[in-house]
From Swiss-Prot:
GO molecular function terms noted in the UniProt entry: 1-(5-phosphoribosyl)-5-[(5-phosphoribosylamino)methylideneamino]imidazole-4-carboxamide isomerase activity
Pfam families: His_biosynth
CDD domains associated with the record: HisA_HisF (cd04723)
Organism name: Candida glabrata (strain ATCC 2001 / BCRC 20586 / JCM 3761 / NBRC 0622 / NRRL Y-65 / CBS 138)
Compartments reported by the entry: Cytoplasm
Disulfide bonds: none
Name of the protein in question: 1-(5-phosphoribosyl)-5-[(5-phosphoribosylamino)methylideneamino] imidazole-4-carboxamide isomerase
Biological process annotations from GO: L-histidine biosynthetic process; L-tryptophan biosynthetic process
Cited PANTHER family: 1-(5-PHOSPHORIBOSYL)-5-[(5-PHOSPHORIBOSYLAMINO)METHYLIDENEAMINO] IMIDAZOLE-4-CARBOXAMIDE ISOMERASE (PTHR43090:SF2)
SUPFAM superfamilies in the record: Ribulose-phoshate binding barrel
Gene name per UniProt: HIS6
Amino acid sequence: MTKFVGCIDLHDGQVKQIVGGTLKDNDDSLETNFVSKYPPSYYAQLYLENRIEGCHVIKLGPNNDAAAMEALNAAPGFLQVGGGINDENCLQWLEKASKIIVTSWLFTKEGTFLMDRLQLLSNKCGPDRIVVDLSCRRTPDSKWVVAMNKWQTLTTLELNKETFTELSKYTDEFLIHAADVEGLCKGIETDLVTKLYEWTKDINKEVKIVYAGGAKSISDLELVDKLSNGTVDLTYGSSLDIFGGKLVRFQDCCEWNSKHN
């Protein structure tokens, strides 16, 4: 059954909601939907108190380590953390995080996927402590390709059945941001959600999939549940009232999870 999963997006040490496609090294082009008056620990405790499991803390760029650690310290062993994770710092973050989320370190600067790095990380941390972030963009020929470097660089890794089958040997969970619709609150990428189910349904082990991007209504939980046969979980961001949104109530998301536990 599809569940609601929470997020804490950090930019320059603050909890923010950002239009994903505008996130670049130069902040002049950044479009921000929301900057919270609350510290990261507030959201960590909120998710913990409501038992919203599998929530992730994402460090978007530099100057976020202290803020991320504040969130993790407020809910030790409960939250996942991503952003700048590599083989040298992974175990340090896992002292307080339930799982690490890894993306850019698995690729060369040009965007070539390095399977040996995932194998190394899996051996070091265990596949059950790793989330592989396969956040992606749709190409003109309707393929879904993993994007890195704040979702600005398209990599050589295409999302398909073969990719998920191979990577699932080294991880139990995938996080997929649909970068083209992230932060727009104009609806989820239904094609992608359907594909995520089709690509992973025959994997011979239990794999968790979390989708983020564009969710704008509480009914999107039901939609994702239908499209994915209950195998894909859903994250809300800018549409959620706890992030300044007016479209979705956090309490309704909590009630959905309780009802479908």
